From Swiss-Prot:
Species name: Homo sapiens
Medical condition linked: Immunodeficiency 40: A form of combined immunodeficiency characterized by lymphopenia, and defective T-cell, B-cell, and NK-cell responses. Patients suffer from severe invasive bacterial and viral infections in early childhood and may die without bone marrow transplantation.
Start and end residues of each stretch annotated as Disordered: 1651-1704
Membrane topology designation: Peripheral membrane protein
CDD domains in alphabetical order: DHR2_DOCK2, SH3_DOCK2_A
Tissue note: Specifically expressed in hematopoietic cells. Highly expressed in peripheral blood leukocytes, and expressed at intermediate level in thymus and spleen. Expressed at very low level in the small intestine and colon.
Subunit structure: Homodimer. Interacts with RAC1 and RAC2. Interacts with CRKL and VAV. Interacts with CD3Z.
A Pfam family hit: DHR-2_Lobe_B
Organism ancestry: Eukaryota, Metazoa, Chordata, Craniata, Vertebrata
Region (Interaction with CRKL), start-end ranges: 939-1476
Residues covered by the DOCKER domain: 1211-1622
Modified residues (Phosphoserine): S588, S593, S1685, S1706, S1731, S1784
Gene from which this protein is expressed: DOCK2
Main localization of the protein described in the UniProt heading: membrane
Protein name: Dedicator of cytokinesis protein 2
Protein's cellular compartments: Endomembrane system; Cytoplasm, Cytoskeleton
Length: 1830
């Protein structure tokens, strides 16, 4: 195989197919992956992925597209740069970055944004292809670049990526080659642009914002139109007149573009095919702001009078007849809102003339109003909006606008009239006429023939232009309307004649009737005429507007004789004025007379740069004709309309300077001319004429020629200044100062021309005059007269504008000196704001770019800045002044940044010495939300950036004393730290932030050198300074903008390549500075532990290795000082918690910390053991903290609670009270979020254990986190108790609440003697007692959960927990929630503990099953009648032991009687703490397993059955309204052998000689079982007796059957096992049931077990059901309480039926056959009594001599009868709507005097006596451990 060789040209490639690597050396690729190629061999490359450089390997060449690159070598590294254009590279990078975000948006289901990004990416991909094609014309490429950059910037903004700053050409600015100030301004501009862009994107009206912004920013615009085709069935030649039209004003606003179309459907001139292009130019912003603009096309047919006429020979040809119009609304295209593309074709539908009185102009209005069907006829055009005038667009769009493109100008002047734009166009519009028919029978077909005639009547050739693109003609013939009395032509033509001919020409209009027949038409002559002169007698042109002309009649030959009509009036108003002396038709001369019945009107518009319509202006322009009126005309100029003046700007200025030049020896007109010049300059300064600035500039440079004007201008100006300085009145001075810029331009230009003409003659005199002129200005500035204040402000504002020009003819240094005097002569506190603004203008001038000028000007500027910045002024003024100050300083720094360093050294030094500290203090005192803060910070950054090493050294030496230097360094460090912590720039200004960081880093290191030199020695050591340094450095290293790992790959590389990893540099500096401290280190322990820890946690390996040893140095330092390092240890534990919770730290850090510290300790044996202990401590804490952080974002709050408790225990074990309490409250908050009020109370209770009932002040570490006010132990404990009691109340843990209430009551009664609080407390206790008795508390289920496998976090891995379920929570629901938390986990279907293979497997395995709580005995309830409401609470609370029973088969199985071989395997669990507690679950700390024999199982089952019977008897005795069905089911299931088989199976299994013989040790158990069977008979008898009383008639047969079965059963049992007797239950009083916790527990009313378990536990399982039942023992479930009405006397609490869980809890009353399958079927919630006690639930210790040891404490002391309980019964008929979950139920309270109380006592005494006889026999079998208290 060929060897691998280094890749030469093939260095950079992109994967174009997916490649799946098959082995280790092969690198898998996806389409689009960018690879760096290192070596090549045959068909393979070796390299790595650009995004993941660690992924290296080989890949086939055919899968890679090679990209051209250039290799740039920097130091020892090669930087490979793609060869494609930068913008294409940027698009590529952007697509990578957006692509990643695009996928994330999809995952996050953000559909709208996902589609938006997708659309933008498609656009960028398409534009990238166009960029790379290299085929775009220059203008299109420029526009495309703008679109691309705009789209990228917009996309980055909405995706919250970094802002990209660009230059004017759209290229990304390089911070290395851009000044800080320029970079800052570029960020500001980019932000503003994007903000505007986003506004436009949100507005659907302006989609093409880039074009819109370009259009709106230019004063002149053009519309390019290309006529592609004209589709229309005419059959004759046609003329197409296209123009722009304003429909609101109903006026045409441009010249017509004429296209002559042939009858065959082609242009008449075939070379014009595909070349019909026109540009409508001179459009200004006013035109763009019109509401509507239409492109209209008026079509005139040229041919016969009527198209329908046949016989072409007889018809008149060549008539211009109206045919139709085409109209298109182009408003959006004009304004740049709609797409403007020269390739997109637009169809303009054609609308024909339908009647003769449909004038083309009138038809436009109709077409606009109605959108009719054109039938496919119309005009096809493409159009594009172009920016600029005709000269500009010829340069910018050469492919569109070439020599063949026709130019159609605007009707009127453009907004800017350039000096070279000589124009003399007069637009004549034929408006309308009204012609009498006289002797004709029909109305005439009038044709107007217009021509331009000289004085002698001869027609001027080629003077009329019908439309742009057409040749000039001698005469114009109008459209002919057939037999219309009042034709309205509205046809516009242009008259263009030389200016010198204007005075002698006039327009002549001939009117002729045109006949449709050629023969008649030849005989027709002109029947009338009109004329009008274009110039008036006073030399002005005809006024724009409408003109009613006189119609002259007479001899047609005379009409061509000018002498015949020129003496007659041409306007109708002239005739009307003479009407008193002349008759209506008598005005005639030479055969022509005025027709009073005929009317003809025209309108004119003069667009001439040479002819004016103003008499005053004309007088000035022609001043030589009447020199005696010169003074008057000069004075009149000020009242001439400004528009007229600027229109003739060049001629007016020429006239003024000619007057000045021709009177050079006299000063007679100097002031008048000067004032006139000032007036004109002032006009141009007006906003209305601001665009004429360019005209004036052009005039001065190209047309101005008055070489002596400068002398006169300077003289008059100095006179004005001197007059004003003396406080005398000088009215024009303010206008003069405002016009100062152009006055000096004229002065300088005049002097330049003079100097060129006379080769520098009189230079000294000129400079002296200029110096005296500036001295006059300075004298004005010194003046103290009130009248001069405004003038001084004006001078400050306008003086800088003259510098550019003065500098050309005057010594720059001298000029600078004059300016220096100009500013220094103003009093220090006067006009400061204006001075600063003026100085800013000077700084931006060319003058300031010269070193010698800066030497003079900079000191005065810095002095002014310093004074102004240090002033204390009111806020509003301060903001303005500071704004001007920072602008000025920015301008100075900007200028200096682009100069050679050698020429700016002293200037930077000047700024540094004078202003650095002032700027720093301004930043420090300025609020971070101040509008100018970012400007000042940028300014400060720029100063520091431009300071060299020598500057730093020099600046340090400027401080006179050490304390001053320390103050400066402290200020700077504090400011830097504050700016790093609160960045003044927006978050997306990445470039600006990084440049600031780079500058700050250099400054910090420079100042650190100063600290080493001056403040390290013991005598000079400055602790606070060093402390500030370390805190600043750590703040710098840990700031978000430097954490590269958090950034995208593109951003990571961008920062690393441009700025490097600044964290390493500062980190190494911190290390070095620490080790230099020597003996001073101890001062920084423990203060610096936290910051150093924060630094070491940065995930950068080299940095960690360099800085972690500092920890050991700290430990060693403290150990040597005090013999231990407790301070360090305490601080590290405190800070570590905070840092890891904040997201810092990882497994690698933990390992690195351990290895480095142990390595360091190995070199110091005396401290090694302590270090090892410390490392173990920190490692344990880190593990727990990382676990905690790992679950903080987890949806599972359970995991968060577990980790919180782990940390609690850690801090408790290590006596960290403050941290312990902090996490207590975190745990409390988590519980409250989950409504775990009980657990929240227990959590808060832990805090109270740290407090005493004393009045001493609480230490800070035992206060609640964030608590402000100091409290005593008693106050805090009392407050906490009240909160906890509230939580216990919400969690229905009233027993606990009462306990705390009692403790509080004791304090109120015995310690603080606050009886008012005591009374409230006792009321609260009473309420809790009442709640215990009246409010239902559902019993929670408990679940064992095992987490097996290495996939779980350490706090769960291979551990078992017991969970306390929520109210009514089923195992299925709990398990589903559990699996949701661990979606990748596998559910285990077995309940046995898994083997090591599962525990060590990499996956996750979850085991979940229900367990039963085991109660501990409560001694205080022994031998006392306790209500079941009290007892039931303890059945599922305060429990720490649980068990799970599972049936197993042993020995031979008898298919007819499986009980004999049915053994129970019982697993017992002991948790770390009792439940409920601070968690809803606790880890199992001990597990054991026992086995229960079939006989013991039978005893348990019989005990359960007896308990159920007794419980139900109690229920029915207590409530006579209960339904009978449940009792029927229970009794029938036992007495009828057909249903369940009764206890016959026990007899077959155990009561045999064979069993007794084989199991002699079970004799006592057999006796016990027989005793239970015997006791069942009286219980059944009592139940049947109750049933007999309650049974309805329809169930009487059922009862009789059941009674018969019972008699048979009774006989059999009493015969076999003896007789048992009970007292008569009829005598028992209806009251609250009570329990005796002695030998047996009496009937219970509320059974919590029945509340929260499934109804699936039969009392006596069959062979089919036993396995399932014992594997998951459950009890019936009830959803909610049902209150008893207040008036009821029922003593029990009832349950309301659930509507939602009918399928699980509601079963109908079953027949006997169905009842055979179960001893108790589930019924409707209202009709079912549910057992809450299955004795198998409560057994936790294996039987030795008695089954009782397996029972709950309530039944463990019972010798012969098992513990019995009754479940809660539902009461039918109660209104569920009134139920409240917390509603207390009313119970009948029985007084001691009740006469039935004795009956109850007798019953209780009976049970005591009956059971006492057995207690001696069984008592010895009860383990002592079970009799202990809770």
């Amino acid at each position: 195989m060929a060897p691998w060789r280094k890749a030469d040209k093939e260095r950079h490639g992109v994967a174009i197919y997916n490649f799946q690597g098959s082995g280790a050396p092969q690198l898998s690729l996806q389409i689009g992956d960018v690879v760096r190629i290192q070596e090549t061999c045959g068909d393979w490359y070796r390299g790595y992925l650009i995004k993941h450089k660690m992924l290296q390997g080989i890949f086939p060449k055919s899968f890679i597209h090679i990209k051209e690159v250039t290799v740039e070598k920097r130091r020892n590294t090669e930087n490979i740069i793609p060869a494609e254009i930068p913008l294409a590279q940027e698009v590529t990078t952007t697509l990578w970055e957006w692509g990643s975000i695009w996928k994330q948006l999809y995952v996050a289901s953000k559909k709208e944004r996902f589609l938006q990004v997708q659309s933008m990416m498609y656009d960028l991909m398409e534009w990238r292809s166009q960029l790379l094609s290299g085929t775009l014309p220059k203008d299109e490429l420029k526009e495309l670049k703008q679109k691309v950059t705009s789209k990228i910037d917009y996309g980055n903004k909405i995706l919250e990526l970094d802002l990209i700053v660009r230059d004017e050409d759209g290229n990304i600015l390089d911070p290395d080659n851009t000044s800080v100030i320029s970079l800052f301004h570029a960020h500001e501009e980019a932000t503003d642009k994007i903000t505007e862009r986003i506004k436009e994107e949100m507005s659907k009206d302006q989609p093409d914002y880039a074009m819109y912004s370009r259009i709106s920013s230019s004063p002149t615009h053009s519309l390019y139109v290309f006529v592609r085709n004209f589709v229309c069935r005419i059959g004759e030649d046609a003329e197409l007149f296209m123009s722009l039209y304003d429909p609101n004003k109903q006026t045409v606003i441009s010249e017509n573009y004429l296209v002559r179309w042939g009858s065959r459907g082609f242009p008449k001139e075939i070379e014009m095919l595909n070349n019909l292009k026109v540009v409508f130019t001179d459009l200004g912003n006013k035109d763009l702001n019109r509401d509507k603009i239409y492109l209209i096309c008026q079509i005139v047919r040229v041919g016969k009078m009527d198209l329908k006429d046949t016989g072409a020979k007889k018809c008149t040809q060549g008539l211009r007849r109206p045919f139709g119009v085409a109209v298109m609304d182009i408003t959006d295209i004009i304004k740049g809102k709609a797409e403007s593309d020269e390739e997109k074709q637009h169809f303009i539908p054609f609308h024909p003339v339908t009647a003769e009185n449909d004038f083309l102009h009138s038809l436009l209005g109709k077409v606009i109003a109605s959108k009719g069907d054109s039938g496919g006829q119309g005009l096809w055009v493409t159009m594009k909006m172009l920016v600029g005038d005709i000269i500009q667009i010829r340069k910018d769009y050469p492919h569109l606008v070439d020599r063949t493109t026709v130019v159609a100008r605007k009707l009127g002047f453009p907004e800017i009239i350039m000096p070279g734009d000589v124009r003399n166009d007069i637009y004549i519009t034929l408006l309308q006429g009204d012609f009498d028919k006289y002797n004709k029978t029909t109305q005439r077909n009038v044709e107007v023939i217009m021509c331009v005639c000289a004085e002698d009547g001869k027609t001027l050739p080629n003077a009329i232009c019908v439309g742009a693109g057409d040749k000039p003609m001698n005469e114009y013939r109008s459209v002919v309307y057939y037999q219309v009395k009042q034709p309205r032509w509205m046809e516009t033509v242009k008259v263009a004649v030389p200016i010198e001919d204007m005075q002698r020409i006039h327009l002549r209009f001939m009117f002729r009737h045109r006949s449709s027949l050629e023969s008649k038409d030849k005989g027709e002559k002109n029947f009338a005429m009109s004329y009008v002169k274009l110039m008036k007698e006073d030399g002005t042109t005809l006024h724009d507007g409408f003109h009613d002309l006189v119609v002259l009649k007479g001899d047609s030959k005379k009409m061509e004789d000018a002498s015949a009509y020129l003496t007659l009036p041409s306007y109708r108003h002239h005739v009307e004025n003479k009407g008193a002396t002349l008759s209506r038709s008598s005005s005639s001369v030479g055969g022509l007379s005025v027709s009073s019945r005929d009317v003809f009107s025209i309108s004119t518009l003069v667009c001439s740069t040479k002819l004016t319509q103003n008499v005053g202006l004309l007088g000035l322009l022609k001043w030589r004709m009447k020199p005696q009126l010169l003074q008057e005309n000069l004075e009149k100029l000020k009242i001439v309309d400004g528009e007229e003046v600027v229109k003739f700007l060049q001629d007016t200025l020429d006239a003024l300077f000619n007057i000045m030049m021709e009177h050079s020896q006299s000063d007679e007109y100097d002031i008048l001319v000067f004032d006139a010049l000032i007036y004109i300059i002032g006009l141009i300064a007006d906003r209305k004429f601001q665009h004429f600035n360019t005209v004036l500039e052009a005039y001065i440079q190209q047309h101005f020629s008055a070489t002596l004007a400068y002398k006169k201008l300077m003289t008059v100006l100095k006179t004005y200044l001197d007059t004003s300085s003396r406080g005398e009145q000088c009215e024009p001075i303010l206008r003069t100062l405002k016009a100062l810029e152009y006055v000096f331009k004229f002065i300088v230009r005049s002097r330049t021309l003079f100097s060129q003409l006379y080769e520098g003659k009189e230079q000294m005199e000129f400079e002296e005059s200029m110096r005296r002129l500036f001295e006059s200005i300075n004298n004005l500035m010194k003046s103290q007269y009130k009248t001069t204040i405004l003038l001084q402000v004006a001078a400050l504002k306008y003086i800088p504008s003259v510098l550019h020009d003065v500098e050309m003819v005057f010594d720059a240094k001298l000029l600078s000196q004059l300016l220096y005097e100009f500013y220094t002569c103003i009093p220090p506190v006067k006009l400061q704001k204006q001075k600063v603004q003026s100085m800013n203008e000077i700084v931006q001038s060319n003058l300031f770019k010269k070193q010698e000028c800066r030497d003079i000007l900079l000191p005065v500027i810095t002095k002014e800045l310093k004074e102004l910045l240090e002033q204390k002024d009111d806020m509003q003024h301060q903001v303005l002044e500071r704004k001007y100050c920072v602008e000025l300083l920015n301008s100075i720094l900007e200028v200096l940044s682009y100069q050679d360093a050698a020429f700016t050294y002293h200037h930077i030094q000047e700024i540094m010495v004078q202003l650095l500290r002032t700027v720093n203090r301004t930043v420090i005192t300025m609020g971070r939300d101040h509008i100018l803060i970012s400007h000042f910070v940028a300014c400060m950054t720029a100063i520091l950036n431009q300071m060299g090493d020598q500057h730093y050294s020099f600046y340090i030496e400027t401080f006179q004393t050490s304390s001053e230097l320390v103050d400066f360094l402290m200020e700077t460090f504090i400011m830097f730290k504050d700016l790093i912590g609160k960045n003044v720039y927006p978050g997306d200004w990445m470039a600006m932030s990084m440049v600031q960081n780079r500058v700050f880093l250099r400054a910090i290191n420079k100042f650190a050198e100063t600290m080493n030199q001056k403040f390290l020695e013991h005598t000079n050591f400055e602790f606070q300074l060093w402390n500030n340094y370390f805190h600043l450095a750590v703040a710098f290293i840990t700031q978000d903008s430097l954490q590269l790992e958090q950034f995208s790959h593109a951003k990571y590389n961008k920062i690393l390549n441009k700025y490097g990893d600044m964290r390493r540099l500062i980190g190494f500096s911190i290390r070095d500075m620490w080790y230099k401290l020597g003996q001073n280190k101890i001062c920084f322990i423990p203060g610096m532990v936290g910051p150093i820890l924060e630094m070491t946690l940065i995930p950068e390996a080299e940095l960690r290795k360099a800085t972690i040893p500092i920890f050991f140095d700290m430990m060693l330092c403290e150990y040597q000082r005090s013999g231990d390092f407790k301070k360090f240890e305490n601080e590290i534990i405190l800070k570590l918690d905070h840092e890891v919770e904040g997201g810092r730290g990882d497994e690698q850090y933990m390992q690195l910390l351990e290895s480095i510290l142990m390595e360091c300790a190995a070199e110091h044996p005396t401290i090694a053991k302590s270090v090892e202990n410390f490392v173990n401590l920190v490692k344990g804490l880190l593990e727990k903290l990382l676990d905690y952080r790992g679950v903080m974002t987890d949806e599972s709050k359970d995991n968060r609670m577990s980790c919180t408790v782990n940390l609690l225990n850690f801090y408790k074990d290590n006596n960290r009270e403050e941290m312990y309490i902090r996490y207590l409250y975190k745990l409390r908050d988590l519980h409250l979020d989950c409504d775990n009020y009980t657990e929240a109370a227990y959590t808060l209770l832990l805090h109270t254990w740290l407090l005493k009932w004393s009045d001493e002040q609480c230490a800070s570490q035992v206060m609640q986190t964030g608590q402000q006010h100091p409290q005593t132990h008693r106050q805090l404990k009392e407050t906490l108790y009240e909160t906890i009691i509230g939580y216990f109340d919400k969690g229905k843990m009233w027993e606990e609440a009462i306990s705390l209430c009692k403790e509080l009551a004791e304090q109120y009664e015995m310690e603080i003697f606050d009886y008012e609080l005591l009374s409230q407390n006792l009321i609260q206790q009473a309420k809790f007692y009442e709640s215990i008795m009246k409010i239902l508390r559902p019993k929670p289920d408990y679940f064992a959960v095992g987490y097996y496998g290495q996939g779980f976090p350490s706090f769960l891995r291979n551990k078992v927990f017991i969970y306390r379920g929520k109210e009514y929570e089923r195992r299925e629901d709990f398990q589903m929630q559990l699996m949701t938390q661990f979606p990748n986990a596998e559910k285990m279907n077995t309940t046995s503990a898994p083997g090591d293979d599962v525990k060590n497997a990499p996956g996750q395995y979850i085991q979940c099953f229900t367990v039963q709580p085991v109660l501990d005995e409560h001694p205080r309830f022994k031998n006392k009648p306790v209500p079941d409401q009290i007892i039931n609470f303890y059945k599922s609370n305060y429990v720490q032991r649980f068990h799970y029973s599972r049936p197993v088969r042993r020995g031979t199985v008898d298919p007819e009687n499986e009980f004999a071989s049915m053994w129970i395997e019982r697993t017992s669990f002991v948790t770390a703490y009792k439940l409920p507690g601070i968690l809803r679950w606790f880890e199992v700390v001990h597990m054991s397993q026992t086995t229960i024999s079939p006989l013991e199982n039978a005893i348990e089952t019989m005990s359960t059955a007896n308990e159920k019977i007794l419980m139900m008897i109690n229920q029915y005795q207590s409530d006579e309204t209960l339904p009978i069905n449940p009792l029927s089911m229970l009794l029938n299931g036992i007495v009828d052998p057909a249903v369940m088989g009764g206890f016959a199976k026990y007899e077959k299994a155990f009561f045999t000689e064979e069993y007794v013989r084989d199991h002699p040790e079970d004799q006592d158990k057999l006796t016990h079982l027989k005793d239970l069977i015997a006791w069942q008979i009286p219980f059944l008898g009592a139940g049947i007796k109750i049933h007999e009383k309650r049974v309805s008639d329809n169930l009487r047969p059922f009862h009789d059957r059941m009674e018969e079965c019972f008699k048979n059963l009774k006989m059999k049992v009493e015969k076999e096992y003896g007789v048992r007797e009970m007292p008569d239950f009829d005598d028992r009083r209806v009251g609250r049931p009570r329990s005796m916790l002695r030998s047996y527990r009496q009937m219970s009313i509320i059974s919590l077990a029945s509340m929260n378990s499934d109804c699936s536990t039969p009392s006596k399982p069959t062979s089919e059901s036993f396995d399932l039942e014992l594997a998951s023992p459950k009890t019936p479930r009830v959803e909610q309480e049902e209150p008893i009405s207040p008036g009821s006397t029922l003593p029990e609490v009832k349950l309301r039926r659930s509507k939602k869980r009918t399928k699980r809890s509601s079963v109908v009353f079953a027949d006997e056959k169905a009842a055979a399958e179960s001893d108790l079927k589930r019924l409707s919630r209202k009709h079912e009594f549910m057992s809450d006690t299955n004795l198998s639930e409560h057994a936790a210790i294996p039987l030795k001599a008695s089954v009782l040891s397996q029972m709950s404490f309530a039944s463990q002391s019972m010798p012969t009868i098992p513990a019995l309980a009754l479940s809660v019964a539902g009461i039918p008929g109660l209104d569920e709507a009134n139920t409240s979950p917390r509603l207390s139920q009313t119970f009948l309270q029985l007084s001691d005097g009740d006469k039935k109380t004795l009956t109850r006592k007798k019953v209780n005494q009976f049970f005591k006596t009956m059971l006492a006889s057995k207690s001696a026999e069984e008592g010895k079998q009860i383990p002592d451990s079970l009799s202990t208290d809770l």
